[in-house]
Curated annotation (Swiss-Prot):
Residues where NADP(+) binds: 205-228
PANTHER family according to UniProt: GMP REDUCTASE
Reaction it catalyzes: IMP + NH4(+) + NADP(+) = GMP + NADPH + 2 H(+)
Location of the active site: 176 (thioimidate intermediate)
Keyword hit for Oxidoreductase: yes
Protein name, as recorded: GMP reductase
Keyword NADP in annotation: yes
Organism: Streptococcus suis (strain 05ZYH33)
An example Gene Ontology biological process: purine nucleotide metabolic process
GO molecular function terms noted in the UniProt entry: GMP reductase activity
Gene Ontology terms: cellular component: cytosol; GMP reductase complex
Keywords: NADP, Oxidoreductase
Entry EC no(s): 1.7.1.7
Family: Belongs to the IMPDH/GMPR family. GuaC type 2 subfamily.
Length: 327
């Protein structure tokens, strides 16, 4: 029963260190395998318009990182696959579940992408199950990620339909207001929801949303994630597609949710908002810092690679770990 499940979120958890067995943190291996491919880090920038565009996707793929291209330039998806494949890079795109997407998936047979993410807000749906089955029938070699979901039942159903990975997280993101608009979601207990879902999963889980610090990546892996999708920490960089705005001499970048009126172009079924983030430096610098911090996490876990993070002990400290600190 759910009521017996402990409820906590990222800021409520501290991982407990083990004896370090490596000489330097730089020896720690942060690579992860998803399907037939290995990637430098178990993180993926959110497939949102203010986070990723074709140039960012190409940069990430060339540097050995996983990426998922957003689905909001529908006509550009086939040329994008071609562009990536011509350079010997993996193609990873998103689709929705509307009727015309079925024809689109069938049209990919000639040049199938390596990864397709079925990307809708409430992924525990018959429409998603049907789309998984259609993709698997038409493109059997393509790795299918389906989401978003927040329960073990949803994970099992999507896996049984043929999904190769599920994306867990309903509204915990910084620019997501699902919990406010609908009363539903995993906001405030995303890490516990991840743990709950991971116990039921037989295939990889991508934790999506609620990541506010690099330490949250290690916590996600501890509670069952194979990969961690991150929005706000990847927003606001020089390469980020979001519009740059100057306020009182300080530069900011737009960051908005995929279900916001700014993305939709209309105020209808809005479950996202727009915020301004102080402009950051280069995306590559953030990725390097994430890698170094994760290597430190592995050293504290007493291991050599990210699998060691799955077995560490933890304590629930209920909102006290900040102790007045900020980063």
């Amino acid at each position: 029963m759910f009521n017996e499940t402990p409820v906590f979120d990222y800021e409520d958890i501290q991982l407990i260190p083990n004896k370090c067995i490596i000489n330097s943190r730089s020896e720690a291996d942060t690579t992860v395998t998803l399907g037939k491919y290995s990637f430098k880090l178990p993180v993926v920038p959110a497939n949102m318009q203010t986070i990723i565009d074709e140039d960012v996707a190409e940069m990430l793929a060339k540097d050995g990182y996983f990426y998922i291209m957003h689905r909001f330039d529908e006509a550009g998806r086939i040329p994008f696959i071609k562009r990536m494949h011509e350079q010997g890079l993996i193609a990873s795109i998103s689709v929705g579940v509307k009727e015309y997407e079925y024809e689109f998936v069938t049209s990919l047979k000639a040049d199938a992408p390596e990864f397709i993410t079925i990307d809708i807000a409430h992924g525990h749906a018959e429409s998603v199950i049907k789309m998984i089955q259609h993709i698997k029938k038409e493109l059997p070699e393509t790795f299918v990620i389906a989401g978003n979901v927040g329960t073990p039942e949803a994970v099992r159903e999507l896996e049984n339909a043929g999904a190769d990975a599920t994306k867990v997280g309903i509204g915990p993101g910084k620019v997501c207001i699902t919990k406010v608009k609908t009363g539903f979601g995993t906001g405030g207990w995303q890490l516990a929801a991840l743990r709950w879902c991971a116990k039921a999963a037989r295939k990889p889980i991508i934790a999506d949303g609620g990541i506010r610090t690099h330490g949250d990546i290690a916590k996600s892996i501890r509670f069952g994630a194979s990969m961690v999708m991150i929005g706000s920490l990847f927003a606001g960089h020089i390469e980020s597609p979001g519009k740059t705005i100057e306020v009182d001499g300080e530069k900011f970048k737009e960051y908005y949710g995929s279900a916001s009126e700014y993305q939709k172009g209309a105020y209808k079924n809005v479950e996202g908002k727009k915020i301004l983030l102080p402009a950051k430096g280069h995306l590559e610098d953030t990725l390097v810092e994430m890698e170094q911090d994760l290597q430190s996490s592995i050293s504290y876990a007493g291991g050599r690679d990210i699998t060691s993070l799955k077995h560490v002990d933890y304590v629930i400290v209920k909102n006290s770990i900040w102790n007045g600190d900020s980063i």
